[in-house]
């Protein structure tokens, strides 16, 4: 009888521990975020000719125009108990992650591209001088929100991004073109992980960058300036 009572007590303690663990939430989530252009399909009208290859495209770190207190925050996890936990990127800033993605895409397209330079506030009078470069690309993050609502039996992941890209003539200090794109992803999955959130962010970022460069007017402006 005492043995049964002992087993029952151990069972109750175990269930209590598991219950506490399931209710516990981390103070913050961090995800890897970036764009790998390896498998990107570059439109033929964007690819450089021999004249374009004689110059370098400068890429500036993006600005962040979101109305938020902390520009490192890129989303939230809504736990089962309703608590909202912040999501931050690992080892990078959102503004740098976007600029690096743009750089990777241009390299995939075949252009000579500089490393990501200092942040540009997108005004012609403050345009940084780019060495050996006729054009520079910068831009703004207008929306970037990764959300995961944890529930049973599935977790709902959604990602929203809105980016604006600026193409500038660094010789004449003139903005030549700007374009805005939006990208969204959604996923229902039985499991929850930071890796899965990061993967959804990667997809949305890649989709936004590819949409930007699919615009023929932007491609035409790049070719025009580099062809001078």
Model-inferred region functions:
Residues 2-10:
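Bacterial N-terminal signal peptides that target proteins for export
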Residues 23-105, 212, 216-228:
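A structural "domain/chain start" motif
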Residues 24-39, 118-174:
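Surface-exposed short loop/turn segments
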Residues 61-64, 140-146, 182-184:
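Generic short beta-strand segments
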Residues 73, 79-91, 168-214:
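Short secondary-structure boundary motifs at beta->alpha junctions and helix caps
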Residues 113-119, 151, 220-224:
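Surface-exposed patches in mature extracellular/periplasmic domains of secreted proteins
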């Amino acid at each position: 009888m005492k043995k049964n009572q002992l087993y029952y007590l151990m069972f109750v303690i175990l269930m209590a521990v598991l219950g506490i663990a399931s209710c516990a939430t981390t103070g913050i989530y961090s995800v890897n975020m970036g764009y790998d252009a390896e498998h990107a399909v570059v439109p033929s009208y964007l690819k450089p000719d021999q004249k374009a290859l004689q110059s370098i495209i400068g890429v500036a770190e993006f600005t962040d125009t979101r109305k938020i207190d902390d520009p490192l925050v890129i989303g939230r996890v809504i736990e089962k108990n309703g608590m909202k936990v912040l999501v931050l990127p690992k080892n990078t800033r959102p503004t740098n992650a976007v600029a690096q993605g743009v750089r990777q895409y241009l390299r995939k397209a075949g252009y000579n591209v500089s490393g990501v330079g200092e942040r540009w506030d997108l005004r012609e009078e403050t345009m940084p001088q780019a060495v050996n470069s006729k054009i520079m690309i910068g831009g703004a993050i207008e929306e970037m929100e990764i959300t995961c609502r944890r529930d049973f039996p599935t977790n709902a992941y959604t990602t929203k991004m809105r980016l604006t890209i600026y193409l500038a003539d660094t010789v004449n200090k003139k903005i030549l073109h700007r374009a805005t794109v939006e990208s969204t992803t959604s996923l229902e999955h039985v499991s929850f992980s930071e890796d899965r959130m990061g993967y959804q962010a990667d997809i949305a970022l890649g989709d936004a960058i590819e949409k930007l460069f699919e615009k023929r007017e932007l491609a035409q402006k790049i070719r025009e300036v580099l062809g001078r």
